[in-house]
Curated annotation (Swiss-Prot):
Pathway: Amino-acid biosynthesis; L-methionine biosynthesis via salvage pathway; L-methionine from S-methyl-5-thio-alpha-D-ribose 1-phosphate: step 5/6
Assigned EC number: 1.13.11.54, 1.13.11.53
Residues that coordinate or bind Ni(2+): 92, 94, 98, 137
Name recorded for this polypeptide: Acireductone dioxygenase
Glycoprotein among keywords: no
Location(s), subcellular: Cytoplasm; Nucleus
Keywords, ordered alphabetically: Amino-acid biosynthesis, Cytoplasm, Dioxygenase, Iron, Metal-binding, Methionine biosynthesis, Nickel, Nucleus, Oxidoreductase
Function: Catalyzes 2 different reactions between oxygen and the acireductone 1,2-dihydroxy-3-keto-5-methylthiopentene (DHK-MTPene) depending upon the metal bound in the active site. Fe-containing acireductone dioxygenase (Fe-ARD) produces formate and 2-keto-4-methylthiobutyrate (KMTB), the alpha-ketoacid precursor of methionine in the methionine recycle pathway. Ni-containing acireductone dioxygenase (Ni-ARD) produces methylthiopropionate, carbon monoxide and formate, and does not lie on the methionine recycle pathway.
Main subcellular location of this protein, as a coarse class: cytoplasm
Binding site for Fe(2+): 92, 94, 98, 137
Cofactor note: Binds either 1 Fe or Ni cation per monomer. Iron-binding promotes an acireductone dioxygenase reaction producing 2-keto-4-methylthiobutyrate, while nickel-binding promotes an acireductone dioxygenase reaction producing 3-(methylsulfanyl)propanoate.
Homology family: Belongs to the acireductone dioxygenase (ARD) family.
Amino acid sequence: MTDCWYIPEAVADRRDENRLSPNVPASYEVLGEVGIFYRHFDPKEVSDDIEGFIQPLLKKLNYQSYDVVNLSPANLGAEKFETLAEQHFMEHIHEDDEVRLILEGQGYFDVRDINDKWIRLLSKPGDCIVVPAGMYHRFTTDQSKDIKTLRIFKEAPRWIALNRGPEAEEKPARKEYLARLHAPAETAVGAANGRTIFSLRYPLKLDVELTAITKRLLEQHSKRPLALAIYLTGSTDPTTGESWCPDCVLAKPHVATRFAELRGKYGEERAIFLQLPVERASYLGNPNFPYRTHPTLQLASVPTLLVLTPAKDAKEKGDVQWHDLLDVKVRTCDADKADVLSLE
């Protein structure tokens, strides 16, 4: 995994790390929220056979062409390099996704979070970054002033930037990006509505947010039973519109069926659905991923479906967290075969 952190609005030297003091780390969940796709490939796998590596990737992403560029004073000349470097660091959007795979050297992508704050994403050999069309961003090399990247395009290679301003704001790509950014999160059972369907993106905030939701639901439905389905699934890959996890794609309709069964048993207002998207870059190869180590979730693989009902003494419990108020009745990686109608 690479590193990402917040930086100030203005920086003295764009090629420094420019961390805040104290450092404020970002996360892949924050990047995912604004549509950034990140994946790391073995740099040797790429550099040993670029053509053999890139052709399957082009097909998967439905892109048509690529080129390789080397940004350095030695390759371009000092004057041309600095001119391009300044252009790349102007805040801008593109009308197509910007797809970059780092081959050699290092650099920084700066992207805006949902509150318009800058996040700096370190980009190293093997890192593949997709910046969605319409998203404000910028790029710089580090102090080495030397980076080699593979660029992927939907059509013929081109790089057209629209600097931040009224003209960029009126572009369809910008308007479509903002519409996606502020749209309700989609889940396996429909759009999140903050009432019976929820999506919580940040693992480190889960307990606080879900405890508040659970207590509110228990108070609202104190005299009638309810059930909470928690679905942990690979987050959506913006390049395909589907989960990065193939098994999660297959599980999605079965999860919807199981939840429909819960609604039939408990009623629409007392069957609650929570989707927990799992970011690939945070999860794979990370034994300390919060959902893995969580005392109740105990995530072993995605997809995983849990169904919980209120603990018998939930009403008597005081200042406790959600997992003290609910009992796990179903835990499965195979939603197709799960029995959610025999809960006691």
